[in-house]
Amino acid sequence: MSSVLTIRGGVPLTGRVSVRGAKNLVPKAMVAALLGNEPSVLRNVPEIKDVEVVTSLLQLHGVTVVKDPVNGDLTLDPKAAKTASSTAIDAHAGDSRIPILLCGPLIHAIGEAFIPDLGGCKIGDRPIDYHLDVLRQFGAVVEKRPGGIHISAPKGLHGAKISLPYPSVGATEQVLLSATRAEGITELSGAATEPEIIDLIAVLQKMGAIISVQTDRTIRIEGVRDLGGYNHRALSDRNESASWASAALVTKGDIFVEGASQRDMMTFLNTYRKVGGGMDIGEDGIRFYHKGGKLNPLVLETDVHPGFMTDWQQPLVVALTQAEGVSIVHETVYENRFGFTDALIRMGASIQVHRECLGSVPCRFGQRNFLHSAVISGPTQLKGTDIDVPDLRGGFSHLIAALAATGTSRVTGIDIINRGYERFTEKLAGLGADFDITTTK
């Protein structure tokens, strides 16, 4: 079964949406519950596909997961953790990349882990080499088997001195989840320090972990023998908040995003203001709106935190197609993130992608033949067309482009968007979008 979204564009999105816990934190906090010897409670949990996948994987490994029918809070009890068959893991994981993060906690809990061949959004190589190398440095034995990789640690996991060649969020999460119960001290240099990483550290600290974050991207973890449970409210999803902000700009709308956090979005908010977007920052959220005038072009470079997030880039590029002048966007985090512009060009956008680094500083992709810089000329009138969603953020970007376009667009592959956007079609309907959903076999 697959769904097709038929969008009739040209209607400004106006109204209110609510944003809950971050996709880039909640599944990892759920995995962290495996490390404890007591139940954990996770609050502010969104209803997204990634949460469903992790719930299934944890239940498969013997973890009891109970969802509060009223507020959606999750209670996770790992006391009966057990091994699971590779076939079952593969069936439950689907195309999620979460299973790699289960490895450290599973080794601590039951002595072994299996990860199927991984999927995820098709926006770059996203190699798991960092993860496997990290696990080896902790003393894990990594074996390739049919359909995936088996990981064990006959002598247990031991602290290590680890240096990442790039501040990878996934590799940093792997270190945190593996080191907290490893014997000895782990020192991680070149770590990612995104707000979701800090929130994961807060979760682990509540469980009894000893973790310190230094100013030079170094994280120090003192291993402890046992951890308890946690009671934690997940931080809000800054990526979803930024997506709705861009949607307001693209459709000349006015959206109040309940739950949007100024503290975690300051770099985005500065850029939004430079483009010409309006905002009113309140205690419970942020109002984003098109001020009625021209949008300004800009030069933008994505980077790791505290820079401009790569996940913010794609929706904002759609807004830049409506800016008056030439904008330049240099993507330094994922090498193939501009594939989504093909559909925008078919809709009438004027976008050229380049292999050269068009930012202020040459990046790691400059000599590797990747199309990682874009030149956007505007404003251009977007026209409806048929679109197949390529990845999570690119897919949402296509949606808001279709909502701003003249005419009708047919969007397929929208199930991908459910991975990170809670009830997005309900929210679109509440904002006044004109669309229909049909289901095909």
Regions found by a protein language model. Give the residues of each.
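Short, structured segments at the rim of ligand-binding sites
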Residues: 1-441
